[in-house]
């Protein structure tokens, strides 16, 4: 039950777009890295190293991303004009935005490469009877974590798909309680998407007033 409560806390913080979600995102994989290594679960060990790195990156991006982006734009001579009505803290923090179209192709390529690589490992080195579905959720989680770290509203699409597929996967495995949890996570992710859309529109209204 401890893991359930941690996941619910993480989802609640993510739903609210709270930067404190990254504290949980740093602590949990940091602990599991040692647990999985001692247990000899090297795939889980490896993915948690990625989650730890993504959480540290996400914290830095959410905390200082807007400042870094504004600095780059100034150097390029493409700064925005008009009165900035945000607080000093808001000027530093990364706002919720749409993912730029230029990232779609490389992110899709990373997803496909991860999907094929993980599936190959599961097929050849494990007794998994659902290697492709397992690989799909893991690969999409990798992409979703990157989108979350960049605070793109579309990250919720990834988690909706991951949670929905996971719910079906756990039903197939006979893990009804876990399937029910992931069905709940799917619903929360849908509400999270619309919550972030609303917050994004509010941020855009505050950012610049001509």
Residue ranges and their predicted role:
Residues 12-23, 146-158:
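Membrane-helix interface "capping/anchor" motifs
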Residues 4-5, 68-92, 96-97, 101, ...:
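Short, basic, low-complexity termini and linkers enriched in Ser/Thr/Gly/Pro
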Residues 1-5, 163:
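Short, small-residue-biased leader/transition segments that mark boundaries at the very start
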Residues 50-72:
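Membrane-water interface of transmembrane alpha-helices
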Residues 116-128, 135-153:
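Alpha-helical transmembrane segments in multipass membrane proteins, preferentially the mid-helix core
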Residues 44-48, 174-185:
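Loop-to-transmembrane alpha-helix initiation sites
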Residues 6-9, 102-121, 186-189:
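Hydrophobic core of alpha-helical transmembrane segments in multi-pass integral membrane proteins
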Residues 3, 44-52, 127-137:
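Structural signature of hydrophobic alpha-helical transmembrane segments
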């Amino acid at each position: 039950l401890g893991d359930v409560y941690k996941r619910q806390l993480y989802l609640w913080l993510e739903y609210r777009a709270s930067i404190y979600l990254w504290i949980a995102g740093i602590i949990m994989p940091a602990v599991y890295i040692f647990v999985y290594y001692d247990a000899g679960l090297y795939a889980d060990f490896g993915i948690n190293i990625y989650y730890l790195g993504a959480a540290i990156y996400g914290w830095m991006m959410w905390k200082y991303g807007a400042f870094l982006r504004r600095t780059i734009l100034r150097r390029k001579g493409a700064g925005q004009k008009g009165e900035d009505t945000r607080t000093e803290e808001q000027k530093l923090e990364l706002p919720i935005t749409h993912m730029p179209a230029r990232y779609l192709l490389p992110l899709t390529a990373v997803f496909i490469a991860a999907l094929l690589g993980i599936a190959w490992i599961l097929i050849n080195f494990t007794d998994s009877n659902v290697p492709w579905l397992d690989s799909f959720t893991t690969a999409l989680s990798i992409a979703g974590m990157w989108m979350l770290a960049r605070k793109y509203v579309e990250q919720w699409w990834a988690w909706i798909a991951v949670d929905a597929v996971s719910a079906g996967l756990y039903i197939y495995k006979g893990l009804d309680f876990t399937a029910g949890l992931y069905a709940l996570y799917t619903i929360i992710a849908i509400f999270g998407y619309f919550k972030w859309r609303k917050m994004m529109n509010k941020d855009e209204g505050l950012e610049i007033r001509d």
